[in-house]
Swiss-Prot record:
InterPro entries per the UniProt record, alphabetical: Leucine_aapep/pepB, Macro_dom-like, Peptidase_M17_C, Peptidase_M17_leu_NH2_pept, Peptidase_M17_N
Gene Ontology MF terms in the entry: aminopeptidase activity; manganese ion binding; metalloaminopeptidase activity
Protein name per its UniProtKB record: Probable cytosol aminopeptidase
Enzyme class, spelled out: hydrolase
HAMAP family: Cytosol_peptidase_M17 (MF_00181)
Length: 503
């Protein structure tokens, strides 16, 4: 679908459809009032007759409104004006896209971007409208043989801004929104792929294709098991021992700042393409969803695509830590003691706490890049789901400014994260009689003790950990990958690049 931005009066629009908002109770938005005045009270008369209350999700399609050039006007219920927040705004946009497609509109001029959303400017409203529209239209049917093409006649959406001064920021919002939406789609597509197709080799092939598509700024290197052995990445290797699929670490380097002093931001994504739990095997119910245990790597891939598409003037390295955790005669066992790349030893108490074993070696590996900051993204703990549910990502960090940056970016992007503590009292839960540490610390504070484990491998740089176990995918009827936290990390990097969305 094509997006553009313009500044114009609603009565002069010759588009097939104009979209305006109505608040509860039967209150016209300012743009709707203009149309009502031009039409000699035609719209307000319909509302007085009870045709539309203005509740969220309500719609009314008007044809051939007097004195209006557009063929149709779509009225969208926006709820109470004072309660229009970010979440409600996105829901209104989603309803708009679905209704326009259902009614056969091929193009529309949307004035919803002129609604007042507390604390949000036109850039934010246009960008979120683009991202939400793309999210609404997403489907994953690559593997279906009988594809039923959904009815989607909508081809062009124009967002209106109040004055010509906002056109530049509106165009930039569309550019950013499309790049972020493409990154989210890429992450969702990877996440939704079945594990018999999407293994570590598949992740590596996608990383190589990204470098081919953006060869000017991107190079990809793939590190296999032989090189991992030479590097001493024994914890990473142990996790993949039970699988017939080779563990592969894909390193995607984007260089947008040629200065020798420009240190990179490193993103590390957990890429367990299937996690059976290993010898500490998981219950069979819901095990199919363990294909989503690579959503951290998928998110990092999506963010790297966004960075390359927008050619941000910063240096970013994305690492996809591809691996598969399976039981078998060669699988690692509870009771094993592993020597990590850092030299620290780990007693394995549970082979289903494998993500941290993969990540700890990758976090040691990335020291060589002398990073400005390192952010790992992982579907790490069920404990984080218990703590924060399926709406908020868990955040831990050894650096307060970095944590504050990420929280701020999460609020800007509408991809929320919440900071959890890292304290010495939690570190004590990882003590082992036989090694430097155990790979689990018991049930209490499980998300935090996982973060504490990782923190022992990040002492040489500023680091943050995003636990996306609750936010990376949905179960039930709407089952599928969400693409989070691509939006959060994209906003963080846009801010670092100087594009913070302020007009």
């Amino acid at each position: 679908m094509e997006f553009s931005v313009k500044s114009g009066s609603p009565e002069k629009q010759r588009s097939a459809c104009i979209v305006v908002g109505v608040f509860e109770p039967r209150r016209l938005s300012p743009i709707a009032e203009q149309l009502d005045k031009i039409s000699d009270g035609y719209i307000s008369a319909l509302l007085r007759r009870g045709e539309l209350e203005g509740k969220p999700g309500q719609t009314l399609l008007l044809h051939h409104v007097p004195n209006v050039l557009s063929e149709r006007i779509l009225l969208i219920g926006c709820g109470k004006e004072r309660e229009l927040d970010e979440r409600q705004y996105k829901q209104v946009i989603q309803k708009t896209i679905n209704t326009l497609n259902d009614t056969g509109s091929m193009e529309a001029v949307c004035f919803l971007t002129e609604l007042h959303v507390k604390g949000r400017n036109n850039y934010w409203k246009v960008r979120q409208a683009v991202e939400t529209a793309k999210e609404t239209l997403y489907s994953f049917d690559q593997l279906k043989t009988n594809k039923s093409e959904p009815r989607r006649p909508l081809r062009k959406m124009v967002f209106n801004v109040p004055t010509r001064r906002e056109l530049t920021s509106g165009e930039r919002a569309i550019q950013h929104g499309l790049a972020i939406a493409a990154g989210i789609k890429a992450a969702k597509d990877l996440g939704n792929m079945p594990p018999n197709i999407c293994n570590a080799a598949y992740l590596a092939s996608q990383a190589r294709q990204l470098a081919d598509s953006y060869s000017k700024n991107v190079i990809t290197r793939v590190i296999g098991e032989q090189q991992m052995r030479e590097l001493g990445m024994n914890a990473y290797l142990a996790v993949g021992h039970g699988s017939q699929n080779e563990s592969l670490m894909s390193v995607i380097e984007y260089k947008g700042n040629p200065s020798e002093d420009a240190r990179p931001i490193v993103l590390v994504g957990k890429g367990l393409t299937f996690d059976s739990g290993g010898i500490s095997i998981k219950p069979s119910e819901g095990m199919d969803e363990m294909k989503y245990d690579m959503c951290g790597a998928a998110a990092v891939y999506g963010v790297m695509r966004m960075v390359a598409e927008l050619q941000l003037p910063i240096n970013v390295i994305g690492v996809l830590a591809g691996c598969e955790n399976m039981p078998g005669g060669r699988a690692y066992r509870p009771g094993d003691v592993l020597t990590t790349m850092s030299g620290q030893t780990v007693e394995v108490l549970n082979t289903d706490a494998e993500g941290r074993l993969v990540l700890c070696d990758v976090l040691t590996y990335v020291e060589r890049f002398e990073p400005e900051a390192v952010i790992d993204v992982a579907t790490l703990t069920g404990a984080c789901v218990i703590a924060l549910g399926h709406h908020i990502t868990g955040l831990m960090s050894n650096h307060n400014p970095l944590a504050h940056e990420l929280i701020g970016a999460s609020e800007q992007a509408g991809d929320r994260a919440w900071r959890l503590p890292l304290g010495d009292e939690f570190q004590e839960q990882l003590e082992s009689n036989f090694a430097d540490m155990a790979n689990i610390g018991g049930r209490p504070g499980g998300a935090i003790t996982a973060g504490c484990f990782l923190s022992r491998f990040t002492r040489k740089y500023n680091w943050a950990h995003l636990d996306i176990a609750g936010t990376a995918w949905r179960s039930g009827k709407a089952k599928g990958a969400t693409g989070r936290p691509v939006a959060l990390l994209s906003q963080f990097l846009l801010n670092r690049a100087g594009f913070n969305g302020e007009e």
